[in-house]
Amino acid sequence: MKNKQPIAPPNAPSNAASKAPPNVPPNAPPNAPLNAAPIALPLARYSAWRRAGDLVFLSGVIAVDPATATIVKGYADIPGDARRLLGETGEFSTDILEGPILAQSWYVLDRIRSTVQAAGGRMDDVFKLVQYFRNLDHFPYYSRVRKLFFSGEPPASTVVEVSAMLPTAEILIEVEATAYIPLSR
């Protein structure tokens, strides 16, 4: 799952925002919603995101690549530029402890960014996040990553600890997002 393409800083504009998402992605399941850009394909039978007027609602995003069903387990599963931004040390004891939650946090927020851009918005349009953690001790690590994606005023936020997440215990975080993206853009 290593991505060799260079990544832009989290708040940089993307070319994806200027292109309308295809009506039906080539790898979409037969019952995929028409608004499912390839980055936002759901992992089960639900909409990854829905628009209601100027509001865009994202279902919970986890650190699983829907195209390959690969779980992000640590630094090795994200691009090198992201690893450097997150502070990969190269020290086994530190990276094995912090790497999984930092990598999953980055992946989830990057997928949210890509989905919001596919809907015609940017991260500054996200005004509400609901973050689910298997262990609240992970919140400070996630918070560090979230600051990379929201450099200005952060969205309203709810944090919840849960006993388990689907599809496996390797999933450490899930994030729902709501954005205000005017149709007139």
Put a short name on every predicted segment.
Residues M1-K2, V24:
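Short, low-complexity, intrinsically disordered N-terminal peptides in bacterial proteins
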Residues A8-P30:
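Long, intrinsically disordered low-complexity tandem-repeat segments
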Residues K2-P10, P29-R185:
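Short, polar/acidic, helix-capping and beta-turn segments at strand->helix junctions
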